[in-house]
Amino acid sequence: ALSGAALAKEKIDFMFPAPVDGKLTMEMTRVIKQFNDSQQDVEVRGIFTGNYDTTKIKAESAQKAGQPPALVIMSANFTTDLALKDEILPMDELFKYGDQKAGDFLHKEFWPAMHKNAQVMGTTYAIPFHNSTPILYYNKTMFDRAGIKQPPQTWAELLADAKKLTDESKGQWGIMLPSTNDDYGGWIFSALVRANGGKYFNEDYPGEVYYNSPTAIGALRFWQDLIYKDKVMPSGVLNSKQISAAFFSGKLGMAMLSTGALGFMRENSKDFELGVAMLPAKEQRAVPIGGASLVSFKGISDAQKKAAYQFLTYLVSPDVNGAWSRFTGYFSPRKASYDTPEMKAYLQQDPRAAIALEQLKYAHPWYSTWETVAVRKAMENQLAAVVNDAKVTPEAAVQAAQKEADALMKPYVDKTALAEVK
């Protein structure tokens, strides 16, 4: 007879961030326990790792220390950098334990807008787990009082509405946009650049960003003008906590935040009716994809790869992924989640949750480059300068950001050019 040790479960480490609030950590802990109890082969140890940026740092540190995590919920725009630096496994290393290639699974089962961020140079390195786009949250009760009939469809309408909603005597603001350098600022800024008709980065080549461009200058000027010229938004760097607090206390008309915050926004909008709409357009309607994907770090054993595959397929199964979507407000990247009876009932009961899906036809990949975090912060830190000071010009800000980003990407660019690029 086999001893107990021979029948022991394969143990794997699973790192996950909770970008919204403490409830997500509790829910993920429940999902892990449910998986562990459901089968005899795998024992998953969940490790909560803070936000997206710290999750990347902790996963890389664990790998360097010889304890690579078998599975990590990683910000979807980190896949490129991790793959180029040879830190993560191509997903086929896990999918060889199943009956199809990772790329086929990705293309068949997931919304097309998710594909680009999951693949690097044609190889699938990630499987989407939960996704978001920025959306416009608005206080419908305040809209009604101000005589605003529908959410703004264009930047001009957004500004006109924000003016009607601003009341300095009450400390009430028309709109707030997050401008923090934790990816929120850059994400929302990229949405404005795209809506203004521009491209934010080269989607096919990780060594190019387009910070110093007319569309980026225009988006930055629009943002700065909302504060200093139109006076419909407070000055300084605003974080998502400040914005949601102002919104819940009835002191804010509109906010551009993630669909991933829908559950949180719904729960806390108690004294008024919460409205949700697509982001307004300027030259075009456009939003970036956000959220996170599952990646697997190099250095794990074959047994751990097999175990990781089992847990991964569980996490993205229509039932589990759909339930996570309903709990959080992130949309499920797995198309079949929306065929489940629970999801159909949920969308019927709260149509606001369908906005992110409707926006998918206007979605584009999340910016991802070589050294993506530092390259992102180059622009975000200039965004901070612009919102902090009316005298900082958008032109100077994008020039400084471009210079810093180019210097950061230079090693990759030189390697591609086969020579030093001056």
Show which residues each predicted segment covers.
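Extracytoplasmic "Venus flytrap"
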Residues: 12-30, 49-50, 132, 183, ...
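Long, aromatic- and glycine/proline-rich binding clefts that accommodate carbohydrate-like moieties
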Residues: 106-109, 270, 274-277, 326-381, ...
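Extracytoplasmic "Venus flytrap"/periplasmic binding protein-like
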Residues: 30-109, 141-153, 246, 253-254, ...
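Extracytoplasmic/periplasmic substrate-recognition and gating elements
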Residues: 38, 146, 217, 221, ...
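Hinge/lid segment of periplasmic solute-binding proteins
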Residues: 76-133, 185-188, 275-277, 344-345, ...
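Short, solvent-exposed loop/beta-turn-alpha elements that line the ligand-binding surface or hinge
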Residues: 92-109, 179-180, 196-218, 267-269, ...
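Short, well-ordered beta-strand elements
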Residues: 9-20, 42-47, 71, 173
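Glycine-centered hinge/linker elements that transmit conformational signals in sensory
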Residues: 161-163, 168, 205-236
